[in-house]
Amino acid sequence: MRKILQRLLSKLFIVSTIIIIQMIWWFFLFYTASVASRVFQDLLYVAAILLSIYIVNRRMKMYIKMSWIFLILSVPIVGIPCYFFFGRPELTSKTQKRMARIVEAYAPLRPENELLNETLRLTDMDAYRQSRLITQNQKYPLYAEDCTEYFKSGEEAFESILKDLRSAEKFIFMEYFIIGSGVMLDQILDILKEKVKHGVVVRIIYDDFGSINAIPPHFIKEMESIGIQTRRFNPYKPMLSVIMNDRDHRKILVVDGRVAHTGGYNIADEYINKKIRFGYWKDAGIRVEGECVNSFTTMFLEMWNYINKDNAVHDEYLNPHNTFSQSEESGFVQPFCDSPLEHDDVGENLYVSIISRAKKYVYIFTPYLILGTELSHAMISAARSGIDVRIVVPKIPDKKLIYLQTKANFRPLIEAGVRIYLYTPGFIHSKCIVADDDTAIVGTCNLDFRSMYWNFEDFVYMYRTQCIGKIKEDAIETFAVSEEVYEESTNDISFAGRLLQSILQLFAPLL
């Protein structure tokens, strides 16, 4: 009873209820007006047609256009208001301009190394094109690898995170989708408190919606009182707004501008298996050192400036260029981010490029598999061309409707020769792709529409780095403890289940 009362009085429940009431009010307003007035009803259908024409001409994926047009033309009283509140993944014009100014101000602090670009071009033209895709769209340059370390679990990563936090002398930047009370947060805060006492600058950004049920109500006040500068991204407010759909899904830790961490894990106990939710929680991440850390530092500073409405460029947190040792055997590394600010969907396009250009194999970890046409076609074409394409998704889901959508993608992929595995020990939250022993991405992006189009995400693109062998090794070990899905099992779904899957697939791009 106490837990039920806590949920009913929680910010998430109260704010969500107010938003739902507003949505119902808008639908009721449209409905009553259309019933009361034939003229309004006719105007509504004219508006639906005009809005559909507008959507056709927008810079948007065709399958997303079709989903919206179907909803708007079939149920205008629902589709039209829904589109204006939820139909635009990109930020509002005012927000876009402000964020664009900040991004443009920091871009010169990440200069390109033309000699390095040329070295990659002469080494592998496919890798060079993938690198240029990132640089041309996101202005994040290519770096020579200094040190990369892959972690195949949250526990493994946490040990390294604590060690790096203890070594901080100048600053610590942390940006996470979820920060939750528990053992993990307590151990981190113990270190941060000591560092603040010794003059280390500590800053934290967390996503308000992601952390809404996990973080203490007065977290910001508590942090500020001990000298930890804390900000929340996009506060979850009781009002319908386009921007409420855009979430900061990134997971970034930067220490002194010399080392950075990212991956699937947030700051909460389930990510290090101190709290069991869906069996064993498997996650993955990466630690990088060297000049490439400047990219993570500027990612954080851009978001910090945006939240603070600060237009100053804080280059004092960047390390000078060309100060890190680089061996001839080192590979190439390119951290970058993707956001609703752009129309180019760099993360998705890079995945498509890696899959399409693979010559031997492509192995993928993702908690959700809700694919757009481009990614689906790339996987199917690669598998039909004889490429060993394998995907691991959870056996135990965290969101049942999303899992039903994930399973709806199985059959066409398996029919084409893609091998799909269910991670039987529990829930796999890793977001990785590795191909041909030389190319990999580790980051925060799921293979679903929300990550690809709505969220702020971060990635590390790698070519021939030290840790790629370990990523492949982790994939092979994970296949061994997972259950492969065969074509026959995709038929064992009831009629009601298939109908629900079909409906979810139709509206998947809108969810």
Model segments located where?
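Surface segments flanking catalytic/ligand-binding clefts of nucleic-acid enzymes
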Residues: 419
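Catalytic-core elements of nucleic-acid end-processing and repair enzymes
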Residues: 431
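Thr-Gly-centered strand-to-loop micro-motif
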Residues: 365-366, 423, 442-443
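Glycine- and other small-residue-rich loops at beta-strand/loop junctions that grip anionic moieties
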Residues: 177, 367-368, 402
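Short glycine/threonine-rich loop-to-helix capping motif typified by GTGT followed
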Residues: 377, 403-407
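N-terminal localization/anchoring segments of enzymes in phospholipid and broader phosphate metabolism
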Residues: 1-349, 353, 357, 381, ...
